[in-house]
């Protein structure tokens, strides 16, 4: 039987994932800043895990083990997010302000909305890929949460962003083509990396704002 503590934590996490970012006026009090951060972190963690699982399943199914390392060091695995001033780890993220990290996170999330909108049409023969039809909705939800955080930190008046919007190519539906397999492999690798960055940024912001004891990650 699961202990009361872990079970309560899981129930709280599930409840937070089910919460909308904003409430109707007069229905419930608006979500606190700490609640917005907690919700965003949970959603980013969930998406990052889903991206990692999908990448591993694709790799196991389609990419021979002997070719994986060499492919990941080619242009196929190059991510456009590497061309923007995005921190590559927790220490670098600590040097950025919360709004800078939120703007970078928003850019990363928005760059995947187009490619992921039809992801389920590409991957249809796997239990992992079977969840892909909801990835777009989950990503839109995280985008909404990041925008809500930006509104809170900017006193409800978001400033015009200075970041160049860019998007990844769409996934290739021709899974019988080697070129398509390599392209999709590279895209899934980038998606996993970008979600890891987004999760890291949100956790850094949450930890330094609220001084939690469990900030080590």
Swiss-Prot record:
Domain of life: Eukaryota
Presence of the UniProt keyword Transmembrane in the record: no
One GO molecular-function entry: growth hormone receptor binding
Phosphoserine carried by residues: 132
Subcellular location as annotated: Secreted
Function: Plays an important role in growth control. Its major role in stimulating body growth is to stimulate the liver and other tissues to secrete IGF1. It stimulates both the differentiation and proliferation of myoblasts. It also stimulates amino acid uptake and protein synthesis in muscle and other tissues.
Matching Gene3D superfamilies: 1.20.1250.10
Record-listed Zn(2+) binding positions: 46, 199
GO terms under biological process: animal organ development; growth hormone receptor signaling pathway; insulin secretion; positive regulation of growth; positive regulation of receptor signaling pathway via JAK-STAT; response to nutrient levels
Lineage: Eukaryota, Metazoa, Chordata, Craniata, Vertebrata
Major localization listed first in the record, in broad terms: secreted
Gene transcribed to yield this protein: GH1
Record-given protein name: Somatotropin
Disulfide pairings: 79-190, 207-215
UniProt KW keywords: Disulfide bond, Hormone, Metal-binding, Phosphoprotein, Secreted, Signal, Zinc
Signal peptide: 1-27
CDD domains per UniProt: somatotropin_like
One Pfam family in the UniProt entry: Hormone_1
GO cellular component terms attached to this protein's record: extracellular space
Keyword Transmembrane belongs to the record: no
Family the UniProt entry places it in: Belongs to the somatotropin/prolactin family.
